[in-house]
Amino acid sequence: MSVIKMTDLDLAGKRVFIRADLNVPVKDGKVTSDARIRASLPTIELALKQGAKVMVTSHLGRPTEGEYNEEFSLLPVVNYLKDKLSNPVRLVKDYLDGVEVAAGELVVLENVRFNKGEKKDDEALSKKYAALCDVFVMDAFGTAHRAQASTHGIGKFADVACAGPLLAAELDALGKALKEPARPMVAIVGGSKVSTKLTVLDSLSKIADQLIVGGGIANTFVAAQGHNVGKSLYEADLVDEAKRLLSTCDIPVPTDVRVATEFSETATATLKSVNDIKDDEQILDLGDVSAQKLADILKNAKTILWNGPVGVFEFPNFRKGTEIVANAIADSEGFSIAGGGDTLAAIDLFGIADKISYISTGGGAFLEFVEGKVLPAVAMLEERAKQ
């Protein structure tokens, strides 16, 4: 993958426009989870250290496009950055007709979604963004799968368009896991729906030596083996698709599970064989035997790609399966890469972040890259590198 990297450029005195992913949860004007800002800080600090005139922007939430809405302002992000950086930081609301930035100063440009045409990759808006800078740095892997004015359009018109350190690291890590993985390679696909991850399962079945399914996805495979899944979340119309996958690749289907008669945090967990599920029960976690079987597979893996939990780990009574699997990944000596919001929440809960080789900041972009789809922002950077 050939792109210009920000780390290869001299940024001194240059106007640098960084598109970061600062889309963080905010409550009462305060950032409640700073993982994405923390991940972006090294890029911002590197540009400031080089004496660049630095602008950074992002989207935050889903405001009505083209309208300012205080609820979705980047002000809480600015306040967070002021605490972390020794450089001056200020928020600018109206910047499309130009903005003055001093060398060594950080200007945060207000939420890009307040600009009409952002999501449609509007050419006139893209050109206005491009006119603000000498160097455009795309560093938001989480939005690289969307062709929008601040992630894609600007890059076509900026004098220089490059990949930031975070984006470059994401692409390197995913390339390492998918292009030439150390073997055996194990891929875990969990979460609730087969339909949204079917193409991912299909793509991975061609790369991975071992495919593991968990969560609601696994329930569809349990049903495909002819078991009653009661009130469990599963997709009846995809049972045949699950059967096809089972016939073409080795997928361990749970043999024991934890069930409940209601979907709630206080529901009682009952451990039982998949042969004994009643009509009023729903599968909410893997059983100990099934979870341990997966842990044994993971122990010997040289590459692990993890997307999605294997049970409703948010409920303490249905956490054990995901915990066993998470700890097995943490203890593995292989290269592990994890992505997706629920996966990151599980990593935080079990305190294993330092034991995962690479944690991807992208959800949708992570999955689309795994599927082998072209990410528009990355394709644009490759195109610009050829010019």
Curated annotation (Swiss-Prot):
Keyword Hydrolase among UniProt keywords: no
Molecular-function GO term, any one: ADP binding
Protein residues bound to substrate: 21-23, 36, 59-62, 113, 146
Residues binding ATP, per UniProt: 197, 314, 340-343
Domain of life: Bacteria
Keywords: ATP-binding, Cytoplasm, Glycolysis, Kinase, Nucleotide-binding, Transferase
Catalytic reactions of this protein: (2R)-3-phosphoglycerate + ATP = (2R)-3-phospho-glyceroyl phosphate + ADP
BP GO annotations: gluconeogenesis; glycolytic process
Location, primary (coarse class): cytoplasm
Metabolic or biological pathway, per its Swiss-Prot or TrEMBL entry: Carbohydrate degradation; glycolysis; pyruvate from D-glyceraldehyde 3-phosphate: step 2/5
The keyword Kinase belongs to this UniProt entry's keyword annotation: yes
EC number(s) stated in the UniProt entry for this protein: 2.7.2.3
Subcellular location: Cytoplasm
GO cellular component, one term: cytosol
Quaternary assembly: Monomer.
Annotated family: Belongs to the phosphoglycerate kinase family.
Designated name of the protein: Phosphoglycerate kinase
